[in-house]
Amino acid sequence: MNVSVVTERRTPAYSSLAAGELNGLVARALLTEARLTPKPGLVDIRNSGAHRDMDLAAFERSTTAIAPWMEKFFIMGNNTAALAAENVLVMLRPLGMACENDMLQATNGVNTHRGAIFAFGLLSAAIGRLLARGEPLEQNRICDQVARLSRNIVAHELSAKKAGKLTKSETHFQCYGLSGARGEAESGFRTVRTQALPVFNRVVQEHDDTHLALLQTLLHLMAWNDDTNLVSRGGLEGLYYVQQQAQKLLWQGGVLVEGGIEAMQSLDDELILRNLSPGGSADLLAVTWFLSHFPAGSLYPE
């Protein structure tokens, strides 16, 4: 079965953005990612991937619950723009916890979007800060603000030795050196900017097909992102297996060649059998789509 979903074309780049518009753009990013099909090991229209406790309807309910919170992150970033960015993160945490609570209520306790709340909460606050400062909304400026908001988050939250049992995130970092979502945020979404966005833009330009561009970008993320969701489910062996399989498909041309979609479906079936789900890469794909709506801007913003 060849599953294909037509996704909307990108809108013109945003030069400005009202708080209410932000809610809608984030919702579209999350729904575009969720409905993209086929996605190996992930919830999509075809199946629920390696997840027995969630489906596409749960992701849609979750998106409806959390999207309105992006305006609140935006306002907090806007109102605290005069403060040093690293002092704002503590003010964003209560919003994140409340947003997560609404997500859990909408999904009957299932974690559908915790990583996305973290990523898009920071992105929304970063946009609020930039607009308050009269700075243009550009990919690199937005990501630079995210990096500033997240400064030293890995050292503070993952590397410190604590009494008692380590969390999964602490274990991933202290045992394997994997910093997960926190490290990606602290880097200003380096993986998205240096790998995902260039692939996405190239495929859109060459093929005029957002659906293919997103699938090819997902393969690149699966191939090179050290996804701690995979480590949680399958250890380093699971991570390396997914990376190797994605790299193999890319060497063959990915979804841009005949049989590419079918190969993605076969990999989906295999990851379901192995109970592997690259959820971190899915979050970064949604971030990629979101950021693609803004101009790139200068590489080193002032």
Swiss-Prot record:
Into which EC class is this enzyme placed? transferase
Q: Where is the signal peptide?
A: none
- Gene3D superfamilies with a match to the protein in the record: Triphosphoribosyl-dephospho-CoA protein
Query: Cross-referenced Pfam families, in alphabetical order?
Result: CitG
Reactions the enzyme catalyzes:
3'-dephospho-CoA + ATP = 2'-(5''-triphospho-alpha-D-ribosyl)-3'-dephospho-CoA + adenine
**Any one GO biological process:** prosthetic group biosynthetic process
Q: Which residues form a coiled coil?
A: none
**Keywords in UniProt for this one?**
ATP-binding, Nucleotide-binding, Transferase
Q: What is its EC number?
A: 2.4.2.52
Quote one Gene Ontology molecular function term.
triphosphoribosyl-dephospho-CoA synthase activity
NCBIfam families linked to this entry: citrate_citG
Q: Which family does it belong to?
A: Belongs to the CitG/MdcB family.
What protein does this entry describe?
A: Probable 2-(5''-triphosphoribosyl)-3'-dephosphocoenzyme-A synthase 1
Source organism? Salmonella typhimurium (strain LT2 / SGSC1412 / ATCC 700720)
